[in-house]
């Protein structure tokens, strides 16, 4: 059964993950009226994907290496529904998740859920089987009101009017991470309330760096405008690690972070997480 809400996701290269996400949406007890896929790149054969359960709209954003904020804003602007659910392309939704999200969603609310992590990208989507493979069980505790400090944008539902009132994601924050922190801070400043439902999502595995040294330039370049707005640097734990390893200046907290050197190939490999612990 279709309900009047839209889903937005953005993608760059993760075709198999996107196919799995679509499969999980199709298996939901209620499905969106539309899925908006924003491709961070030019059209390709996969950007013709369709579904028998809901309408898939394909949009395109090019010109930057990783135009995350622009892509998300493009997706939200294309939504025809009052309620919009943003989902990271790596996520698989629990069959009853949308029911729970919509039962809570409304003006002034941001609704999210808990995340459990899969060790692989599955060949077939069967949520009841896959949830048993996840690193941690999906939490069953429902927090009615929470601070936005730990909010992650992997999945959230918001009213389109509330998103528009914030003017979406700030496109001055390019690339990874800092734009998410800014969006959460602006939601909190606007008086929105964060709710968490317990149905959960599963995150399909992909290699990553911890700390995210592959996004060193994004974090450093976005640090100053974030501090100018909020009075503190974002991702201070990452900046501390970057300084410890000599990639940025030691006195970054006083004079602002600056790139001192680029990580070596050996250093990059040492921080690569290639499997789920």
Please tell me what each predicted stretch does:
Residues 84:
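Short aromatic/hydrophobic "clamp" motif used to bind/position activated sugar donors
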Residues 1-24:
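N-proximal low-complexity "stem/linker" segments adjacent to membrane-targeting elements
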Residues 155-158, 162-167, 173-198:
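A short, conserved alpha-helix in the catalytic core of glycosyltransferases
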Residues 23-32:
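Short, acidic, metal-binding catalytic loop of nucleotide-sugar glycosyltransferases
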Residues 63-79:
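Glycine-rich, basic loop-to-helix element that forms the pyrophosphate-binding segment
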Residues 197-213, 225-226:
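Active-site donor/metal-binding and catalytic loop motifs
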Residues 114, 129-149:
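Short, flexible, basic/aromatic active-site loop/helix in glycosyltransferases
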Residues 96-127:
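Conserved donor NDP-sugar-binding/catalytic core segment of glycosyltransferases
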């Amino acid at each position: 059964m279709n309900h009047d809400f839209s889903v937005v996701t953005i993608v760059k290269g993760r075709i198999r993950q996107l196919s799995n996400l679509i499969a999980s949406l199709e298996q939901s007890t209620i499905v969106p009226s539309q899925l908006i896929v924003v491709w961070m790149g030019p059209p390709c054969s996969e950007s013709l994907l369709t579904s028998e359960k809901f309408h898939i709209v394909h949009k395109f954003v090019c010109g930057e290496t990783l135009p995350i904020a622009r892509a998300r804003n493009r997706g939200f602007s294309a939504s025809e529904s009052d309620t919009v659910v943003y989902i990271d392309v790596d996520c698989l939704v629990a069959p009853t998740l949308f029911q729970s999200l919509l039962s809570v969603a409304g003006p002034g609310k941001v609704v999210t859920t808990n995340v459990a992590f899969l060790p692989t990208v599955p060949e077939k989507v069967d949520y009841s089987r896959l949830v048993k493979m996840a690193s941690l069980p999906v939490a069953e505790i429902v927090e009615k009101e929470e601070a936005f400090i730990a909010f992650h944008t992997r999945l959230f539902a918001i009213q389109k009017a509330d998103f528009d009132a914030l003017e979406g994601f700030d496109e001055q924050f390019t690339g990874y991470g800092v734009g998410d922190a800014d969006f959460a801070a602006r939601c909190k400043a606007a008086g929105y309330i964060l709710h968490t439902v317990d149905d959960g999502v599963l995150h399909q595995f992909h290699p990553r760096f911890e700390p995210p040294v592959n996004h060193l330039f994004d974090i450093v370049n976005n640090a100053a405008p974030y501090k100018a707005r909020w009075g503190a640097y974002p991702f201070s734990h990452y900046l501390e690690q970057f300084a410890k390893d000599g990639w940025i200046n030691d006195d970054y907290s006083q004079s602002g972070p600056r790139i001192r050197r680029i990580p070596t190939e050996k250093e990059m490999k040492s921080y690569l997480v290639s499997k789920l612990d």
